[in-house]
Amino acid sequence: MGRAPCCEKMGLKRGPWTPEEDQILVSFILNHGHSNWRALPKQAGLLRCGKSCRLRWMNYLKPDIKRGNFTKEEEDAIISLHQILGNRWSAIAAKLPGRTDNEIKNVWHTHLKKRLEDYQPAKPKTSNKKKGTKPKSESVITSSNSTRSESELADSSNPSGESLFSTSPSTSEVSSMTLISHDGYSNEINMDNKPGDISTIDQECVSFETFGADIDESFWKETLYSQDEHNYVSNDLEVAGLVEIQQEFQNLGSANNEMIFDSEMDFWFDVLARTGGEQDLLAGL
C-alpha cells in the first residue's frame, strides 16, 4: 500500500489557517457535524486535508475548549492521572473537559515533569541479557567447592600406603593387622600409635625380603623331583593300561578259537551219528 501524496501535489494549502477558513470550518461542522474527516474538506469547500481540519477543530475551534494557563487543580489531576495511565494523553484529556491531549502533553513535558522531585524516566529495557547467568563471585565459589569435594572424595576412596601406616598425634590407640603367609600361618602386626613415635611392625610378620631369603636351591630341587615322579607314575600307569588291553584282546582271541573248534567237533560228531558210526564211514570210503 503506497503512501498518499502530500498536500502540495494535491493542490492543497499548508501553513497557518486564515480567519475565513476557520469560519467556513466552524459553520460546516455546526450544521453538518464531522462524521468523515477525509471527505469533510471537499464538502466544506476548503483546500485543506482531513487531518489538518480535524486538528484545527479539536485544538482551537471547538466551542468548549478552555483558553489560558492550567490551574493548580488541573496540574495535580494531570500528575495523579499520569501515575495511573502513563503517557496515554487522550485518556487523560477525557478526564479533563475543555483540555486537549496536545495541551496536556505540552504542559507535562515543559512544567510538570520538572516539578516532580522523585520522577525517574523509564529505563530502556535491555533484551540482550542472558538468562541463567550467575555472578562471577558465585561461579568462582561453586567451582572451588566442587573441586574441593572431588579431592576429598578421591582421598577417601583411594587411600595411599602412607596414610594406612601414618600416625596422628591426637590418637593413642593400638591397631593390629593379620597377614596370611604362604604356608598357611597367620602373623599379627601391632602398631602402637603414640604421640611423636613411628609405628613399627613385628619382625615375625612375613615380608617379601624374608620370603625370598627362605627359598633356597633345595626347594626348587624338591619341586622338580616331585614333578618328575609324577611324570614317571603317569607313564607307568599308561604302560600298565596298554598291557591290560593287550591281554584282554589275547583272551578274546583264544576264546573265539575255542568256540570255533568246539563247533567243528560238534559238526563231525553229528555226521558220524547220522552215518552209523566210524566203521560205516570207513567202509563207505
Curated annotation (Swiss-Prot):
PROSITE patterns according to UniProt: HTH_MYB
Region Disordered, residue ranges: 115-172
Compositional bias per record (Low complexity), positions renumbered to this chain: 159-172
GO cellular component: a single term: nucleus
Keyword tags: DNA-binding, Nucleus, Repeat, Stress response, Transcription, Transcription regulation
Domain HTH myb-type: 9-61, 62-116
Molecular function GO labels: DNA binding; DNA-binding transcription factor activity
Record GO biological process: response to cold; response to salt stress; response to water deprivation
Domain of life per record: Eukaryota
Reported induction: Induced by abscisic acid (ABA) and drought stress. Induced by salt stress.
Residue stretches of biased makeup (Polar residues): 139-158
DNA-binding region coordinates: 37-61, 89-112
Tissue occurrence: Expressed in roots, leaves, stems and flowers. Expressed in stomatal guard cells.
Compartments reported by the entry: Nucleus
Function: Transcription factor involved in cold-regulation of CBF genes and in the development of freezing tolerance. May be part of a complex network of transcription factors controlling the expression of CBF genes and other genes in response to cold stress. Binds to the MYB recognition sequences in the promoters of CBF1, CBF2 and CBF3 genes. Involved in drought and salt tolerance. May enhance expression levels of genes involved in abscisic acid (ABA) biosynthesis and signaling, as well as those encoding stress-protective proteins.
Quaternary structure, from the entry: Interacts with SCRM/ICE1.
Additional remark text: Plants over-expressing MYB15 have improved drought and salt tolerance.
Database matches in PANTHER family: MYB FAMILY TRANSCRIPTION FACTOR, TRANSCRIPTION FACTOR MYB15
Protein name as annotated: Transcription factor MYB15
Organism: Arabidopsis thaliana
